[in-house]
């Protein structure tokens, strides 16, 4: 069975093989599918604001005359098995599904129901798990062992939950020598765990100057202000993490242009890295 995968938009995590397509079918796309004897078309939708576009793609790809299916995270399809390279670029992997938390701004709880499902561990270097620190000790150790074998330095893009990090996990992460690991500062309750996480990671051997420790900072939601958001971003630097502003977007994907401008000042690596370096240099001078 050969599956053509279709995506409403192309991202840095999209697969790059010959049967990964973006948008409506072109004559060349159709020819490629016929040549490869494609038997199914899967339209994968990550963002809810792309659902309408996916509906158009569903009808457009009927031209191949093979079954067309629509699914993906936008439809709360998050707890299934994982096949490397199918819907994500090679190297991007899930080793578990689900999360134990129930964050108001996140769609994962709708399908995870507070549970984490451990998956067979496959080779890869970019860990996308929603809550890998919530997996069993045996699973976490096995994932780290796998990462040590990879030629590419690992990245924990899915994020590490500050409140769950234990010192042995921090020590093991340091042994893996990741290029970057990400955590999140989403609500006020996250600050103290974030500070403690920074202490544990530094105790393990991580240094702020390496820019390995990174943190997504949610901003732009109802009731937020530029002053409060900037305060959280500074607090993130104080905890030892390079901050990256993450703009809140509702089900329709809309956002305030003013917040978008604010986010840009705090999401580009060159800018945030410079702000972070200036902050830590000032701290060392005092």
Enumerate the language-model features and the residues they cover.
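A structural motif corresponding to the C-terminal lobe/cap of the Radical SAM core domain
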Residues: 175-176, 180-182, 189-286
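Short alpha-helix in the alpha/beta-hydrolase fold that links the catalytic acid
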Residues: 57, 117-118, 228-232
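Core AdoMet radical
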Residues: 5, 40-48, 107-201, 210-222, ...
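N-terminal pre-triad scaffold of radical SAM enzymes
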Residues: 1-11, 83-113, 122-133
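Glycine-rich, charge-decorated loop segments at or immediately adjacent to ligand/cofactor-binding or catalytic sites
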Residues: 76-83, 253-258
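Short, acidic/polar
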Residues: 24-33, 165-173, 226-232
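Short beta-strand elements of ligand-binding domains
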Residues: 64-77
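A short, structured N-terminal alpha-helical element that caps or precedes a catalytic domain
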Residues: 1-67
């Amino acid at each position: 069975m050969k599956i053509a995968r279709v995506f409403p938009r192309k991202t840095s995590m999209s697969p790059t093989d010959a049967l990964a397509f973006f948008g409506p079918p072109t004559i060349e796309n159709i020819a490629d599918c016929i040549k490869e004897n494609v038997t199914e078309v899967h339209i994968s939708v990550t963002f809810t604001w792309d659902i309408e576009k996916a509906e158009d793609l569903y009808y457009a790809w009927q031209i191949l005359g093979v079954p067309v299916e629509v699914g993906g995270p936008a439809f709360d399809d998050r707890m299934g098995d994982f096949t490397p390279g199918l819907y994500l670029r090679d190297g991007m992997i899930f080793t578990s599904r689900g999360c134990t938390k129930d964050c108001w701004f996140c769609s994962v709880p709708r399908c995870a129901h507070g549970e984490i499902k451990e998956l067979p561990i496959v080779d890869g270097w970019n860990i996308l798990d929603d809550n890998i620190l919530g997996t069993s000790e045996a699973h976490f150790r096995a994932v780290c062992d796998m990462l040590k074998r990879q030629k590419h330095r690992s990245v924990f893009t899915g994020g590490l939950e500050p409140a769950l990090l234990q010192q042995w996990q921090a020590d093991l992460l340091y042994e893996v020598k990741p290029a970057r690991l990400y955590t999140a500062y989403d609500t006020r309750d996250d600050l103290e765990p974030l500070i403690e996480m920074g202490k544990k990671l530094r105790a393990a051997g991580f240094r702020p100057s390496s820019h390995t420790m990174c943190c997504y900072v949610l901003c732009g939601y109802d009731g937020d202000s530029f002053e409060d958001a900037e305060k959280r971003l500074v607090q993130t630097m104080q905890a030892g993490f390079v901050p990256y502003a993450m703009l809140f977007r509702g089900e329709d994907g809309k956002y305030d242009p003013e917040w978008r401008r604010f986010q840009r000042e705090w999401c580009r690596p060159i800018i945030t890295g410079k702000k972070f370096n200036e902050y830590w240099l000032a701290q060392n001078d005092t």
